[in-house]
Amino acid sequence: MSNKKVIKLIKLQIPGGKANPAPPIGPALGAAGVNIMGFCKEFNAATQDRPGDLLPVVITVYSDKTFTFITKQPPVSSLIKKALNLESGSKIPNRNKVGKLTQAQVTAIAEQKMKDMDVVLLESAKRMVEGTARSMGIDVE
């Protein structure tokens, strides 16, 4: 694989197990000349154990139109909404609070997301999760 030249990196967020050729996946991959159905089948097979989770994926397209992809952990905001069973954050986060996040929940989210964050210490990851929660209008205990 080292002799193949990378021609494009495509970053998308796709629900786990639900990739289909409709926008935004189809146009993004079609412009790069990638087999769209081939990607959808591979992605759905790889993420069938995580249905409904919004998963960031980085697709590497090579000069011979082959591809590889890496799935990452869901965004922190999605993990927070899932932990608190929310549809969305507050429209006015500094005034309207929509929930409370405990330190145990913050730690669990930080541990899950830490490998995708550029941090070494768990405390740094927890501070990032707390900041995201505050920007969504969620109090952190």
Swiss-Prot record:
The keyword RNA-binding applies. Keywords: Methylation, Ribonucleoprotein, Ribosomal protein, RNA-binding, rRNA-binding. GO terms for molecular function: large ribosomal subunit rRNA binding; structural constituent of ribosome. One or more lysine residues are methylated. The keyword Metal-binding does not apply. GO terms for biological process: translation. GO terms for cellular component: cytosolic large ribosomal subunit. Gene3D superfamilies: Ribosomal protein L11, C-terminal domain (1.10.10.250), Ribosomal protein L11/L12, N-terminal domain (3.30.1550.10). It holds the Pfam family Ribosomal_L11_N. PANTHER family: 60S RIBOSOMAL PROTEIN L12, LARGE RIBOSOMAL SUBUNIT PROTEIN UL11M. Forms part of the ribosomal stalk which helps the ribosome interact with GTP-bound translation factors. Belongs to the universal ribosomal protein uL11 family. Part of the ribosomal stalk of the 50S ribosomal subunit. Interacts with L10 and the large rRNA to form the base of the stalk. L10 forms an elongated spine to which L12 dimers bind in a sequential fashion forming a multimeric L10(L12)X complex. This is Large ribosomal subunit protein uL11.
